[in-house]
UniProtKB/Swiss-Prot annotation:
Designated name of the protein: Protein DOWNY MILDEW RESISTANCE 6
Organism: Arabidopsis thaliana (Mouse-ear cress)
UniProt gene name: DMR6
GO molecular function ontology, one term from the record: flavone synthase activity
Domain Fe2OG dioxygenase: 188-288
PROSITE patterns assigned: FE2OG_OXY
């Protein structure tokens, strides 16, 4: 079982066979462009109407944007990164106490994405945590490093508030009431994936994570500021998203694409590797309550002309999440299964 993890400290000189992608499904890193006009939004702006306009343009055009002056203290962010690095540098024996291939487990260390279903693995280890309500899950979290529970608890609370603030702005940017998303999504769950991508001997042959969309409502990503690895697909072209100091990367998940009736996009994105440096990222996912019914917001289609109809049929988040995990990560957009005929 221990051989499944790649965060061992061992430096491979060639890529093991089970990570090598077919020629037609390789990242073609030389064809990736730099995204020069990637939105950077200052959440401390006092001009709310301008802020809402920026959010609308970013969500409709890119499905991604970065935010600065978001309210999370730099010390909390630095501590989160530090304790995550410390976790992955622990001994295999210590880490394997948390290892599981079962995606239903609320706290688990695993590798790739869904190893039970994959034919080719991804160059990634990750620690998956449920973070809300914290008191329900914190005792499952790693006891080592000793500061892990305290730091992650603090970070999770802060990031949750950032997410709520952004969801309000997104609601308003669609012309909806400020609290529309909050009401529809219900008591939102919160998950975290602490991703670790070791140096890879042949980055052009594999992925850290292949192209995928996020099944949740909103993702708040803390990127490693020293290594670029996130790429997004726009108009058929892959673009690298360079990390910005002290910024979070925000992306629209599948549920907000459905709620916006397709106005906002849950965009394909991927993580690539490099030969020199390990890369760390911390993704926080805000998720609708399992029983929350997802359907295109009526004000977005009822008042329009007769040809404007809901793009997606109604479904619960529990139904969607089950479908998402029953498939390979890089299959068709999971929302395709919920289109209105």
């Amino acid at each position: 079982m221990a051989a499944k993890l790649i965060s061992t400290g061992f430096r491979h000189t060639t890529l093991p066979e089970n990570y090598v992608r077919p020629i037609s499904d390789r990242p073609r890193l030389s064809e990736v462009s730099q995204l020069e006009d990637f939105p950077l939004i200052d959440l401390s702006s006092t001009d709310r109407s301008f802020l809402i306009q920026q959010i609308h343009q970013a969500c409709a055009r890119f499905g991604f944007f970065q935010v600065i002056n978001h309210g999370v203290n730099k010390q909390i962010i630095d501590e989160m990164v530090s304790v995550a690095r410390e976790f992955f540098s622990m001994s295999m024996e210590e880490k394997m106490k948390l290892y599981s291939d079962d995606p239903t487990k609320t706290t688990r260390l695993s590798t790739s994405f869904n190893v039970k279903k994959e034919e080719v693995n991804n160059w990634r280890d990750y620690l998956r945590l449920h973070c809300y309500p914290i008191h329900k899950y914190v005792n499952e979290w790693p006891s080592n490093p000793p500061s892990f529970k305290e730091i992650v608890s603090k970070y999770s609370r802060e990031v949750r508030e950032v997410g709520f603030k952004i969801e309000e702005l997104i609601s308003e940017s669609l012309g909806l009431e400020k609290d529309y998303m909050k009401k529809v999504l219900g008591e939102q769950g919160q998950h975290m994936a602490v991703n670790y991508y070791p140096p890879c001997p042949e980055p052009e042959l594999t992925y850290g994570l292949p192209a995928h969309t996020d099944p949740n409502a909103l993702t708040i990503l803390l990127q490693d500021t020293t290594v670029c690895g996130l790429q997004i697909l726009i108009d058929g072209q892959w673009f690298a998203v360079n990390p910005h100091p002290d910024a979070f990367v925000i992306n629209i998940g599948d549920q907000l694409q459905a709620l916006s009736n397709g106005v906002y996009k849950s965009v394909w994105h991927r993580a690539v590797t490099n030969t020199e440096n390990p890369r760390l990222s911390v993704a926080s996912f805000l998720c609708p309550a399992d029983c929350a019914v997802m359907s295109p917001a009526k004000p977005l289609w009822e008042a329009e002309d007769d040809e404007t109809k809901p793009v997606y049929k109604d479904f619960t988040y529990a139904e969607y999440y089950k479908k998402f995990w029953s498939r390979n990560l890089d299959q068709e957009h999971c929302l395709e299964n919920f289109l209105n005929n």
